[in-house]
């Protein structure tokens, strides 16, 4: 086996490709000296043999074999012939997966403008040429001629547009016997555009623009700066303006635009194949018309159709009529495949499905601490399975991975104990789409729960913008020690109390919490059950309430030796009683204090309700933990 080659790279740069580079992408030289790579036929596969047609859109000579280690004609079959190029069919004997990256190219019989740079916003071609977009379109789509060189004609200027009649008039003057016009050049179509772009001297243009900007003001200055910025970018990247007009177009690998046979014998194919077929057909027809020296008007019409076919291939619907397939559905062009939510970048590169992740519906978990989440058992055993298997083997409970998996599938009780050990101190990350700010993904300590729903603390809902009407959340397990440390130190819910946008607290009590706190501490004079009773501790009060001995809002006395704060002054006793044993009882507004003869406090009972005791007890427990 050959060692796998790993190419180290820092970034991917997207820019203009020169015709030479496009040709390099697809061109290969066979051992017999034959150069392959150009796609010349619109055919895809032979419907009798179901094999790709040579020089077609699925050609095995250009893109590689359709079957592993097998050439087109069948002379070489087996891995032992690796690297051999069949002398009969010219197909290299290699793996079929090369068809995922080998490209081809189509050499165009006439240059065509790239629709992104022509019809994009802003139109870079029109900015560079300093012409209105409407005029540039007139040239590209063969509606108007453009003066490439005025020569000695006084009535003509460089880049001036001419109608058909005006050009015929000038042509008559040029070819008349007593003609004085010399050096007049007029063009039409993308060829004229190519000439205009090639004539631009970027450095010289940038220099003169900088001088003009110094004197210009207002709208004109803004326009000049816009043009200078484009020119500077061309200089910085080393791209040439004429590369925006294509003489060669790349053909993407066949496995990225597949053709598959359906059950009924029919074929389903990617829309790109239809768009490429249109381009090849029109290109071949144009080449044939040029060969037989067809009338100019016919050739020009074919060039316009080729331009439209390439436009549809690159960005269908950007200009002119949208090309539709069967059942009037617009065909998906290269731009449609790249852009949008379902495009290659967002769907396949940024939005990959990842291992060690799961998703489920969320339900409220009011008994959880803010840094905890309830993770269903069956989800946890799946997510943490490698860790559990490792722990089972290390502890000697099983000898190999297969035995460990069998133990897990049998739901052996020992597995749950191991799982508890594994998840202790191992944070998980919860994410709710759409992740609009950094608090859309936070980490929690998992607590194993029954059922199939993830339990979420109600206080973190505003950060996730979550509610419990069927929302789903994704769980991700950080694997490396570094990621676990980051999850614990930076992403733990208890560390994300303030909103990154406003700096105000995002974890604030609301709804049930506020209502519950209000109800516990509210006054209700009608609550009389157990009113006036004395209790020796806060725990006794809670126990009496749980046994339904007292009402939640009944006023009672409970012994409490700590300090008491009140929003109302309570320093002067309302009533003082001298007891027979020499002690005194001081009755304040909210407490009852018993003192000895020296004034030392013997006991203190506070006047409160069971609801307030429960509320106070909950806060004390939270602070203590």
Curated annotation (Swiss-Prot):
Sorted UniProt keywords: DNA-directed RNA polymerase, Magnesium, Metal-binding, Nucleotidyltransferase, Transcription, Transferase, Zinc
Pfam families linked: RNA_pol_Rpb1_1, RNA_pol_Rpb1_2, RNA_pol_Rpb1_3
GO molecular function, one term: zinc ion binding
Catalyzed reactions: RNA(n) + a ribonucleoside 5'-triphosphate = RNA(n+1) + diphosphate
Cofactor annotation comment: Binds 1 Mg(2+) ion per subunit.
Cofactor requirement: Mg(2+); Zn(2+)
Binding site for Mg(2+): 467, 469, 471
A Gene Ontology term for the protein's cellular component: DNA-directed RNA polymerase complex
Residues binding Zn(2+): 71, 73, 86, 89
Record-listed E.C. numbers: 2.7.7.6
Gene Ontology BP annotations: DNA-templated transcription
Recorded family membership: Belongs to the RNA polymerase beta' chain family. RpoC1 subfamily.
PANTHER family: DNA-DIRECTED RNA POLYMERASE (PTHR19376), DNA-DIRECTED RNA POLYMERASE SUBUNIT BETA (PTHR19376:SF54)
NCBIfam families associated with the record: PRK02625.1, rpoC1_cyan
HAMAP family attached to this UniProt entry: RNApol_bact_RpoC1 (MF_01323)
Function, in words: DNA-dependent RNA polymerase catalyzes the transcription of DNA into RNA using the four ribonucleoside triphosphates as substrates.
Subunit organization: In cyanobacteria the RNAP catalytic core is composed of 2 alpha, 1 beta, 1 beta', 1 gamma and 1 omega subunit. When a sigma factor is associated with the core the holoenzyme is formed, which can initiate transcription.
Protein name: DNA-directed RNA polymerase subunit gamma
Source organism of the structure: Nostoc punctiforme (strain ATCC 29133 / PCC 73102)
């Amino acid at each position: 086996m050959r060692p796998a080659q790993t190419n180290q790279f820092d970034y991917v740069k997207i820019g203009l490709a020169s015709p030479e580079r496009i040709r390099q992408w697809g061109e290969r030289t066979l051992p017999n000296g034959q150069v392959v790579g150009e796609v010349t036929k619109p055919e895809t596969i032979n419907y009798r043999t179901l094999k790709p047609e040579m020089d077609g859109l699925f050609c095995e000579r250009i893109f590689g074999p359709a079957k592993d280690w097998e050439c087109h004609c069948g002379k070489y079959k087996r891995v032992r012939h690796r690297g051999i190029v069949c002398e009969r069919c010219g197909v290299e004997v290699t793996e079929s997966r090369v068809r995922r990256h080998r490209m081809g190219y189509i050499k165009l019989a006439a240059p065509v403008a790239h629709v992104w740079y022509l019809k994009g916003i802003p139109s870079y071609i029109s900015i560079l040429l300093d012409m209105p977009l409407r005029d540039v379109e007139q040239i590209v789509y063969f509606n108007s001629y453009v003066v490439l060189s005025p020569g000695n004609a006084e009535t003509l200027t460089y880049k001036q547009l001419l109608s058909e009649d005006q050009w015929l008039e000038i042509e008559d003057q040029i070819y008349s016997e007593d003609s004085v016009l010399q050096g007049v050049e007029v063009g039409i179509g993308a060829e004229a555009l190519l000439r205009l772009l090639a004539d631009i001297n970027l450095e010289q243009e940038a220099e003169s623009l900088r001088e003009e900007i110094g004197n210009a003001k207002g709208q004109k200055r803004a326009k000049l700066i816009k043009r200078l910025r484009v020119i500077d970018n061309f200089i910085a990247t080393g791209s040439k303006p004429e590369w925006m007009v294509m003489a060669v177009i790349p053909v993407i690998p066949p496995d990225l635009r597949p053709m598959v046979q359906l059950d009924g014998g029919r074929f389903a194919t990617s829309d790109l194949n239809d768009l490429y077929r249109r381009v090849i057909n029109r290109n071949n027809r144009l080449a044939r018309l040029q060969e037989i020296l067809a009338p100019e008007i016919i050739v020009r019409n074919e060039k316009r159709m080729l331009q439209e076919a390439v436009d549809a291939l690159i960005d269908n619907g950007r200009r002119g009529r949208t090309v539709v397939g069967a059942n009037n559905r617009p065909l998906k062009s290269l731009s449609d495949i790249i852009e949008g939510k379902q495009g290659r970048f967002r769907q396949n590169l940024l939005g990959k499905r990842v291992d060690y992740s799961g998703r489920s519906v969320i339900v409220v978990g009011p008994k959880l601490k803010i840094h905890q989440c309830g993770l269903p058992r069956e989800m946890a055993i799946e997510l943490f399975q490698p860790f559990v298997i490792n722990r089972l083997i290390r502890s000697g409970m099983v000898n190999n991975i297969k035995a460990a998996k069998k133990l897990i599938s049998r739901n052996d009780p020992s597995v749950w104990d191991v799982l508890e050990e594994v998840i202790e101190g191992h944070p998980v990350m919860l994410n709710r789409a759409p992740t609009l700010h950094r608090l859309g993904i936070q980490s929690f300590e998992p607590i194993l729960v029954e059922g199939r729903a993830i339990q979420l603390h109600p206080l973190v809902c505003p950060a996730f913008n979550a509610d419990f009407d069927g929302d789903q959340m994704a769980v991700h397990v950080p694997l490396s020690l570094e990621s676990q440390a980051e999850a614990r130190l930076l992403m733990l819910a208890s560390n994300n109390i303030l909103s990154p946008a406003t700096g105000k607290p995002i974890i604030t009590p609301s709804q049930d919490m506020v209502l519950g706190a209000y109800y516990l501490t509210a006054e209700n004079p009608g609550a009389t059950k157990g009113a006036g009773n004395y209790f020796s501790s806060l725990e006794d009060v809670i126990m009496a309430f749980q046994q339904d001995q007292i009402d939640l809002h009944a006023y009672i006395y409970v012994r409490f030796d700590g300090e008491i704060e009140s929003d109302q002054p309570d320093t002067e006793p309302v009533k003082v009683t001298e007891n027979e044993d020499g002690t005194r009882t001081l009755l304040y507004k909210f407490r009852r204090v018993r003192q000895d003869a020296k004034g030392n406090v013997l006991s203190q009972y506070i006047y409160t309700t069971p609801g307030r005791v429960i509320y106070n007890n909950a806060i004390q427990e939270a602070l203590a933990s």
